[in-house]
Amino acid sequence: MQVRVLDTTLRDGEQTPGVSLTPEEKLRIALKIDALGADIIEAGSAITSEGEREGIRKITSEGLRAEICSFARAVREDIDAAISCDVDSVHLVVPTSDLHLEHKLRKTREEVLEQAVDCTEYAVDHGILVELSAEDSTRSDMDFLRTIFREGIEAGAERICACDTVGILTPERSYEFYRGLSELGAPLSVHCHNDFGLAVANSLAGLRAGASEVHATINGIGERAGNAALEEVVVALKSLYDVDTSINIEMLYETSRMVARMTGVYLQPNKAIVGENAFAHESGIHADGVLKKAETYEPITPEMVGHGRGFVMGKHIGTHALRKRLDELGMKVADDKLMEIFRRVKTLGDMGKCVTDVDLQAIAEDVLGVMEDKVVDLQEVTIVSGNRVTPTASVKLRVDDREVLEAGTGVGPVDAAIVAIKKSLEDFADITLEEYHVDAITGGTDALIDVVIKLRHGDRIISARSTQPDIIMASVEAFLSGVNRLLANEKSEGTH
């Protein structure tokens, strides 16, 4: 048995409060989800807006492997909009509960049934595959639900879907519910929401009951409490039930990160499968056990989903354990560099920060990149900034054994500091900042900040970076690190 996967990140997922994707962003996510292996991509709802249609058209024009689908109500206008986007199929959604019929549509069961049949026939006549979906099906009369599906199948629907729209199923009820719909003569899909935190469990129960397709979103994003998380469903199917999907499981982590970054909906650290702590272990018994045999505390390997294993360190770390971990990370350091890394790790630990492998690598790379002989050395930096104060910085540098004091203003404290440094160096070198990139490499307001910059001096461009808990100091140190590399190169070439 192989379960089909309909990814609805671009439709149901985009209904997450605060998420709005541009056509270009939707295309980038669709390309990634297609590479991931989803069978069907619900690209959006074509009737929504011209921008939405533009996004769907961009996706359909790519000739992707996946079937491209548009959400549609049982209204011909919705289907026409989908047809204009050249989609392969429509996810034709019809409310079926009396609650929805009375208070939302203000229609009778007979009227809704007629609409469902008419729009199914209309879409099929225009060469569009129909997946007929019952909204709020889990609060619907089962006889009416079966009637809608039977009539829809006779009208040409190739697949049917029963939506647990407000997430009220339990795994036991989910099994019984989908079992009761599995013999209607068309492939059945499960579509579960996460209002009680049961979307994944209910989806798995529905698939066990006879459904052959699951609707899910990357990271479980969606309105209210979200949808079934695609990564959790497919890994559970593979690992716990030995059921295959078309998903390339090794791409799950990178896909999750991309979607989180582009939607701005970041993951809780302990999110199953793709969270930063999903394979992280504190020092002690667990870490020791995992180092000896990973299966002692890991049900699946991080490599299976494209993730990595992490060991968290803090203020109790010793130099021996630190060196061992650096060796395991492939980083050979001299004793003096080790002590500087050790000092920084201890400092972060005293601030209440746990240091992960990502932190440690960033700190070590920063320390190993520090040159012994600096042309420019920072003596002092002072920043003044506020809502009624122009950001101002003063810096004291030692440049070739000369002390230089300068001040600068900018649009923010980082800009002011860089302006002051550039003014300090005007008599020594013409340095241009080409690129500036900042990233919080760990979560929280006390996150480590990784600053990467590109500097130009003449025809030479170099990159430099610094990692600090303080964005201003990280930016200043990255800038000066780059300046020192440029000027040191000139010295070695005899041009300075």
Curated annotation (Swiss-Prot):
It is an enzyme of class 2 (transferase). GO terms for biological process: isoleucine biosynthetic process; L-leucine biosynthetic process. It holds the Pfam family HCS_D2. Its EC number is 2.3.3.21. It catalyses: pyruvate + acetyl-CoA + H2O = (3R)-citramalate + CoA + H(+). CDD domains: DRE_TIM_IPMS. PROSITE patterns: AIPM_HOMOCIT_SYNTH_1, AIPM_HOMOCIT_SYNTH_2, PYR_CT. Residues 3-253 form the Pyruvate carboxyltransferase domain. GO terms for molecular function: (R)-citramalate synthase activity; 2-isopropylmalate synthase activity. Keywords: Amino-acid biosynthesis, Branched-chain amino acid biosynthesis, Isoleucine biosynthesis, Transferase. Pathway: Amino-acid biosynthesis; L-isoleucine biosynthesis; 2-oxobutanoate from pyruvate: step 1/3. PANTHER family: (R)-CITRAMALATE SYNTHASE CIMA (PTHR42880:SF2), HOMOCITRATE SYNTHASE (PTHR42880). NCBIfam families: LEU1_arch, PRK00915.1-2, PRK00915.1-3. Catalyzes the condensation of pyruvate and acetyl-coenzyme A to form (R)-citramalate. Belongs to the alpha-IPM synthase/homocitrate synthase family. Homodimer. This is Putative (R)-citramalate synthase CimA. The lineage of its organism: Archaea, Methanobacteriati, Methanobacteriota, Methanomada group, Methanobacteria.
